[in-house]
A protein has these predicted regions:
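Short, surface-exposed "cap/lid" segments of acyl-processing enzymes
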Residues: 1-21
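Active-site loop/oxyanion-hole signature of alpha/beta-hydrolase fold enzymes
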Residues: 15, 21-57, 74, 102
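Residue in the alpha/beta-hydrolase core beta-strand immediately N-terminal to the catalytic nucleophile
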Residues: 20, 58, 81-84
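Gly/Ala-rich beta-loop-alpha elbow adjacent to hydrolase catalytic centers
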Residues: 60-65, 69
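Flexible "cap/lid" loop of the alpha/beta hydrolase fold
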Residues: 74-114, 137, 165-172
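Active-site nucleophile elbow and catalytic-triad environment of alpha/beta-hydrolase enzymes
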Residues: 128-146
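Short beta-strand/loop motif that positions the catalytic acidic residue
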Residues: 150, 156-158
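Conserved loop-alpha-helix segment in the C-terminal half of the alpha/beta-hydrolase fold
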Residues: 160-186, 190-193, 198, 205-206
Length: 211
């Protein structure tokens, strides 16, 4: 989904790694009987950054991915200079995707996992590359033990007030928080697919001191 965004950023001289979270591989999960949870995904991204060369990272997460990058930042805030939530959940300690989302999405999760209780099937109309999502990652609460550095840039990129968005109230709250920068690309939730050029432009313009 982020291939076009990554390609534009590469052309502008940025190093980009688009991570496919465990269980969402294009050819299916490694072990369908053991769906990964939120901790699995936080561990995965943490390990990728640990293997890097130490250059400060701008860490981006879309939708559920906001849960993941918040968990990584709690562990590796000294390795990051930016957190970018792309129409994404922004958790506090003890929150989960389940607790932060709307009733309609909770119903969607349960209905989608009815077949096996493990994987949430892809709703009709989504990107054809989308894969069933592991239910445990939606319901596990995040554990955030520290306080993020005020020097860490925090950006929220809103897709606008699309029908059913669980992010409208969050967006307005962050607009009034001086620790955050808020951008709007009003094309709906799937910003990377619908307007990759605008998303790449916002990401490419982020500065290390933009807290």
């Amino acid at each position: 989904m982020f291939d076009s965004v990554a390609a534009e950023l590469h052309r502008d001289g940025h190093h980009v790694e688009a991570v496919t979270l465990s269980g969402l591989e294009s050819d299916g999960p490694v072990d369908v009987d053991r769906p990964p949870n939120l901790d699995t995904h936080i561990d995965q991204v943490t390990e990728i950054i640990d293997r890097g060369d130490g250059t400060p990272v701008a860490l981006c997460g879309h939708s559920y991915g906001g849960m993941v990058i918040a968990g990584v930042a709690d562990r590796l805030s000294d390795r990051l200079d930016q957190l970018v939530f792309i129409d994404a959940y922004v958790p506090d300690d003890g929150d989960s995707c389940w607790s932060l989302t709307s009733d309609s999405f909770r119903e969607l999760f349960i209905a989608g996992a009815r077949a096996d209780g493990r994987w949430v099937v892809v709703p009709e109309g989504l990107d054809p590359r989308a894969r069933p999502h592991p239910l445990p990652s939606f319901v596990q609460s995040i554990r955030i033990g520290g306080t993020l550095s005020r020097a860490l840039g925090r950006t929220f990129i809103s897709g606008g007030a699309w029908p059913g968005s669980p992010f409208v109230t969050l967006t307005e709250r962050l607009r009034n928080d001086s620790a955050w920068r808020v951008h709007e690309i009003p094309v709906g939730h799937n910003i990377a697919r619908r307007d990759p050029h605008s998303l790449a432009a916002v990401l490419g313009a982020l500065l290390p001191d933009s807290a």
